[in-house]
Amino acid sequence: MAHLELLLVENFKSWRGRQVIGPFRRFTCIIGPNGSGKSNVMDALSFVMGEKIANLRVKNIQELIHGAHIGKPISSSASVKIIYVEESGEEKTFARIIRGGCSEFRFNDNLVSRSVYIAELEKIGIIVKAQNCLVFQGTVESISVKKPKERTQFFEEISTSGELIGEYEEKKRKLQKAEEDAQFNFNKKKNIAAERRQAKLEKEEAERYQSLLEELKMNKIQLQLFQLYHNEKKIHLLNTKLEHVNRDLSVKRESLSHHENIVKARKKEHGMLTRQLQQTEKELKSVETLLNQKRPQYIKAKENTSHHLKKLDVAKKSIKDSEKQCSKQEDDIKALETELADLDAAWRSFEKQIEEEILHKKRDIELEASQLDRYKELKEQVRKKVATMTQQLEKLQWEQKTDEERLAFEKRRHGEVQGNLKQIKEQIEDHKKRIEKLEEYTKTCMDCLKEKKQQEETLVDEIEKTKSRMSEVNEELNLIRSELQNAGIDTHEGKRQQKRAEVLEHLKRLYPDSVFGRLFDLCHPIHKKYQLAVTKVFGRFITAIVVASEKVAKDCIRFLKEERAEPETFLALDYLDIKPINERLRELKGCKMVIDVIKTQFPQLKKVIQFVCGNGLVCETMEEARHIALSGPERQKTVALDGTLFLKSGVISGGSSDLKYKARCWDEKELKNLRDRRSQKIQELKGLMKTLRKETDLKQIQTLIQGTQTRLKYSQNELEMIKKKHLVAFYQEQSQLQSELLNIESQCIMLSEGIKERQRRIKEFQEKIDKVEDDIFQHFCEEIGVENIREFENKHVKRQQEIDQKRLEFEKQKTRLNVQLEYSRSHLKKKLNKINTLKETIQKGSEDIDHLKKAEENCLQTVNELMAKQQQLKDIRVTQNSSAEKVQTQIEEERKKFLAVDREVGKLQKEVVSIQTSLEQKRLEKHNLLLDCKVQDIEIILLSGSLDDIIEVEMGTEAESTQATIDIYEKEEAFEIDYSSLKEDLKALQSDQEIEAHLRLLLQQVASQEDILLKTAAPNLRALENLKTVRDKFQESTDAFEASRKEARLCRQEFEQVKKRRYDLFTQCFEHVSISIDQIYKKLCRNNSAQAFLSPENPEEPYLEGISYNCVAPGKRFMPMDNLSGGEKCVAALALLFAVHSFRPAPFFVLDEVDAALDNTNIGKVSSYIKEQTQDQFQMIVISLKEEFYSRADALIGIYPEYDDCMFSRVLTLDLSQYPDTEGQESSKRHGESR
């Protein structure tokens, strides 16, 4: 098997001197520390295989010499040489030598050119451009992240289809150009064919055109004779009818004058009555104003009186309550005085009883001196013997006395608290009743207040709206008056203007659809600055009356003559000779056409404006107007904003004060609207004033609301005071008293129980003491004859103590009663003082109420007097209004009669005007028909007169124009026409319907023929010559089209050939790789479940779009390449590299650190695959840093660095074939089991 044997390098990069690297085995790994020069082996192989210098990590070729990178090249030359051994054993050498700044190539030690050198490399399977035997460091990682388009480019390099890109693009560009030329020639041929058809049609149309002209001429003669014949008949009938109507009209005019005089007299009487009514209304308004002032004063006085009366009632009620309380207080004082008198009587009775007892004691036992001494001695013995018990007894008695006094005090307090509690309950009941009354009164006030508030809101809203509207109306009215005053026209119009306005109104009534109005009323300038200029251009036509037709204009002129009114200018829409607009004038700078600065709401009026203004131009200044009028190739009619007019003839007409006066007519046309609006606003203002008078009612309601609110406030304050202060205080006091009462009762119970218990103990101690006394005083008692010593002592000692105690109790009770009596009397005195104060207040309030009632009565009297006067004036107004309405009714009746006669006169005038209009219309029709015959050269025969005498009516002054027209019509009446050529059936027609129907038929025939002639283009005299020219051009275009189509077919064939070659080269490579990559990926992964597949984005031309590459790792679901791990991406990239290598296999394959991104598992898989493939497929040389990988190789080449001035590389070799590959055997065994 062919293989790379040795690599000989000399002074190349890190290799100093001549170094031999090899021999290389089927699977050789190059190892060494980082920076030792391993990758320089890869660069040496690339260099010797013809790689470009730019791809060898240097800028120029001399940097490849050892030491050049530090500026100390060891030699001026360097070389790299490989020894390649064929399967037959034949050796081939390839060498590349650096000499100076270039390199030379040697094959088998013979100097050859680069192309020969590359060809020899391709013979052994090494393609330099595709780099099919070298995989540089990082290439594997870059392959895994290539974009589909980049992957396509990679395949084009491998398949060599990329060499055809230039030729492919060139052929494609030529094909597109040829197809475009063919399409262009085809379109040209089609257009010339259409021209040929058109030329044929022109020839046929020229022949038809002449026959149509002859037929049209005969029909026009018949039409004109028919119209002239029946026109003359109609003129004769109208003259007869006009004489009858004029006689009836003169009779009706006399009746109209009579009724007009009656109406004027009635109007004068109505004016006098109206003035009287206005004076009455003025007085009534004054009275109502005064009444509106007095009525609130009366209401206020009434409310004040009512308020004081209520205060007086409250005071009286307070006196009544205070007197009731005083009466009760007096009863309590009497009870206390009675109790005090009873106590004094009992005390006196007790003292009297004591005196009797003292007299009785003098008769009782009395001891001798010896016995008394012995008593004292025995008593001292007893005292000493019972001293302890006596002390305890005295203590108990003192405590007992204290508790008894406390019990008596608590019982007194109990009685007092019960009395106070009863009084508090009564006061609470009184306040509750007061609360009920106040709540009821408050509710009544609130209901009344709510009702009045609603009325107030309604009135306020109505009055505010009225005031707002009055303000708006007054502003509008002031604005209208200001506009009228500014215009200087807020005065009565002159009789002349009024007469002209009445005449115009009369004409509008006679011809409502035909008389439009004066020209300045129907249009206006778009801005005020153009008013003078437009007025100047309009000239005498500014006050002209615009009518629909010439017939109406003539009827109006006849009416003016009959009414002896001032002459008027009429502009008939159907009679105006309008010149076309020169559109080029609109493009001139510094000016505008006059017709463009005039605005109108009537579309039909544009013809009139165009007739009056022509092609006139308006300019900002006089200089601009002069320049535009005189400086151009043609003179123009121009006008400046100040009214200066430049005519084409060179005449200059300046603006004047008279022109400014005339220009005011643009504002005068708004007068009628302004006056109408002023009348409407005045009437509306009167209605609003009536509504505004409701302010009096509003003030009354507001006064009532204010009084009610005040009363409600006082009531609510009192209610709140009672609820939140008085009643709460009473409830708190009641609660305190009840609590105090419970405390007193519980205290009394506790004291009673304590007294009972202590009394028992006192009794026990007393019995013990008594027994001791009895023992000691036994003999003494027997001597004095008493049962025991206590009997003696009670009679003489204890009785005195009881008397003293009783006196003390009497004293205490008397003191208590005196204190209570003094307090009650003091309280009663305060109540009486309060009652006296309230009585004084009542007396003063009564006096104030008397004064207030008098003021109220005075106000009421004034209001009643004003109301009576108001009613009197209203009655007068009703009477005056009735009289005015009666006279107005009479005026209306007379006016109806006047209008009825006026309508009859108008009807007759309208009929006269209508007949005259019809007559003038018929004369005009005859004139126009004769004029048409002359102008259109229609050959009718005249028995008298000549068509040459027919002239067009010229526009001069109105009087001149009317007289000229009459002269022309009289002259034309003398013409006698020969109707012998007119068909008899057309002469025999009588009714207007039949005449109109036949006229329409004749007109349709002529119009149809004219329409055909109009639609038919004038014949082309050169149609035959054009037809021949077009035929020659058609033949030329046909020849050009065939030639371009042939050229396009040839370009298509050439392009398809290149496309097929490129497609075949690319597809051959792609199909081989896409088939083999799946098996290679399975072998690399050591698992048949792994999948790898390639798919083109453009199956028809895959080299134009991208190529997708996807792998499914064992045990994982499908996911995009970007989502695979680093090791999986590396394995997938290696599979692609090995698959591409299998398409164009090189004899050896050099890889630079392809295992960098692989983990130990994937390293084992990749190394096993490489081991298998190197047995019989290709030679593999790998630069590796991982022991798991290079331990599987057949031989190792070690690269290590040495240093002096610069680093240089050394090489070691080791044959591993003598060492068994146990790991590889185990891996193969596991792989076999997994299968």
From Swiss-Prot:
Residues 156-490, 666-934, 970-994, 1022-1049 form a coiled coil. The modification N6-acetyllysine is found at residues 648, 713, 1033. GO terms for cellular component: chromosome, centromeric region; cytosol; lateral element; meiotic cohesin complex; nucleoplasm; nucleus. Pfam families: SMC_hinge (PF06470), SMC_N (PF02463). It is found in: Nucleus; Chromosome; Chromosome, Centromere. CDD domains: ABC_SMC1_euk. Gene3D superfamilies: 1.20.1060.20, 3.30.70.1620, P-loop containing nucleotide triphosphate hydrolases (3.40.50.300). GO terms for molecular function: ATP binding; ATP hydrolysis activity; DNA binding. ATP binds at residues 32-39. Keywords: Acetylation, ATP-binding, Cell cycle, Centromere, Chromosome, Coiled coil, Meiosis, Nucleotide-binding, Nucleus. Residues 514-629 form the SMC hinge domain. The keyword Transmembrane helix does not apply. One of its GO terms (biological process) is sister chromatid cohesion. Forms a heterodimer with SMC3. Component of a meiosis-specific cohesin complex, probably composed of the SMC1B and SMC3 heterodimer attached via their SMC hinge domain, RAD21 (or its meiosis-specific related protein REC8), which link them, and STAG3, which interacts with RAD21 or REC8. The cohesin complex interacts with the cohesin loading complex subunits NIPBL/Scc2 (via HEAT repeats) and MAU2/Scc4. NIPBL directly contacts all members of the complex, RAD21, SMC1A/B, SMC3 and STAG1. Belongs to the SMC family. SMC1 subfamily. The flexible SMC hinge domain, which separates the large intramolecular coiled coil regions, allows the heterotypic interaction with the corresponding domain of SMC3, forming a V-shaped heterodimer. The two heads of the heterodimer are then connected by different ends of the cleavable RAD21 or REC8 protein, forming a ring structure. Meiosis-specific component of cohesin complex. Required for the maintenance of meiotic cohesion, but not, or only to a minor extent, for its establishment. Contributes to axial element (AE) formation and the organization of chromatin loops along the AE. Plays a key role in synapsis, recombination and chromosome movements. The cohesin complex is required for the cohesion of sister chromatids after DNA replication. The cohesin complex apparently forms a large proteinaceous ring within which sister chromatids can be trapped. This is Structural maintenance of chromosomes protein 1B. It comes from Homo sapiens. The gene is SMC1B.
